[in-house]
Amino acid sequence: MEHDRLYNLYLTNSIYKEAFVGSWVVQECAEAVARHYLDRKRHRPAHSMRVEVINTDTMETISEYEIV
């Protein structure tokens, strides 16, 4: 994996159609960052949240997580 690339983090579900959260260089932190974001905002959805990490160079989805 290339750690020098920039990755964007998006949260989606029926409430957040596509909420841009921010950019990180290391994609492994995406799930932890998403959990922290939701806790801080007190937006804990009743159902699962899909987290997408997107490579900003190619706009391809690098990884996805389900947060319940």
Regions found by a protein language model. Give the residues of each.
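Short aromatic-glycine-(Arg/Gly/Cys) micro-motifs in beta-strand/loop hairpins
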Residues: 1-20
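Surface-exposed loop/edge segments in extracytoplasmic proteins
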Residues: 16-22, 59-64
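Aromatic side chains
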Residues: 7-10, 37, 65
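A short, charged, amphipathic alpha-helix used as a generic interaction element across diverse proteins
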Residues: 13-16, 24-50
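Short, mixed-charge low-complexity intrinsically disordered segments
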Residues: 39-68
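A broad "ordered helical/assembly scaffold" signature
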Residues: 4, 20, 31-32, 53-54, ...
